[in-house]
Each structure stands twice: as structure tokens, then as C-alpha cells.
């Protein structure tokens, strides 16, 4: 686990690509710059999709735990 301050949590357990990334985009759109979203997922595609989403949308992937499910991703909203 990590001690990163979380502003919001998004549970995407049971959802499959592209739903986790679509919900991530929708959720982070309503957050303030600098806030942190914790995404909880079990879709193996998220291991590549979340980092690609962050890079493409200029958000920062602060940390990820992908060794076991559920996967966890800490995303800091960019501009």
C-alpha cells in the first residue's frame, strides 16, 4: 500500500475494456487539477490502458500495484 492522499476512488471491478478507461476519463474530468484518483480494477487490459491514458491526457500516474488483483492505480489530475 501507499500513503498517497486520495481525493476520490473509482471502483471498476468486473468491468472490461474500454469501460474502466471511459469511467476514469469521466471521473477525472470532474476533479480539480492536482487531485488524486484511486482506480481499483481487475481487467488485465488496465495494466497498459491506464498508463497510456495518463500519458495521452497529461495526467500523472503516481503509483500502481499490478502484481495481483485487484489492481490499483493512483492518478494525479493534470491540466
UniProtKB/Swiss-Prot annotation:
Name this polypeptide is given: Sulfur carrier protein TusA
Family statement: Belongs to the sulfur carrier protein TusA family.
Keyword line: Cytoplasm
Compartment list: Cytoplasm
Classification via PROSITE patterns: UPF0033
Organism: Actinobacillus pleuropneumoniae serotype 5b (strain L20)
SUPFAM superfamilies in the record: SirA-like (SSF64307)
Biological processes, Gene Ontology terms: tRNA wobble position uridine thiolation
GO molecular function: sulfur carrier activity
InterPro entries the UniProt entry points to: Sulphur_carrier_TusA (IPR022931), TusA-like (IPR001455), TusA-like_sf (IPR036868)
Keyword Cytoplasm: yes
PANTHER family: SULFUR CARRIER PROTEIN TUSA, SULFUR CARRIER PROTEIN YEDF-RELATED
GO CC entries: cytoplasm
Keyword Cell membrane in annotation: no
CDD domains the UniProt entry points to: SirA (cd03423)
Role of this protein: Sulfur carrier protein which probably makes part of a sulfur-relay system.
Active-site residues, as the UniProt record annotates them: 17 (cysteine persulfide intermediate)
Database matches in NCBIfam families: PRK00299.1
Amino acid at each position: 500500500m501507499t500513503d498517497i492522499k486520495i481525493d476520490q476512488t473509482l471502483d471498476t471491478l468486473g468491468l472490461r475494456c474500454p469501460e474502466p478507461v471511459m469511467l476514469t476519463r469521466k471521473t477525472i474530468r470532474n476533479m480539480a487539477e492536482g487531485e488524486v484518483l484511486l482506480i481499483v480494477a481487475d481487467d488485465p487490459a488496465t495494466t497498459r490502458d491506464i498508463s497510456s491514458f495518463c500519458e495521452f491526457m497529461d495526467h500523472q500516474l503516481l503509483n500502481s500495484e499490478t502484481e495481483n488483483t485487484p489492481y490499483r492505480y493512483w492518478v494525479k489530475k493534470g491540466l
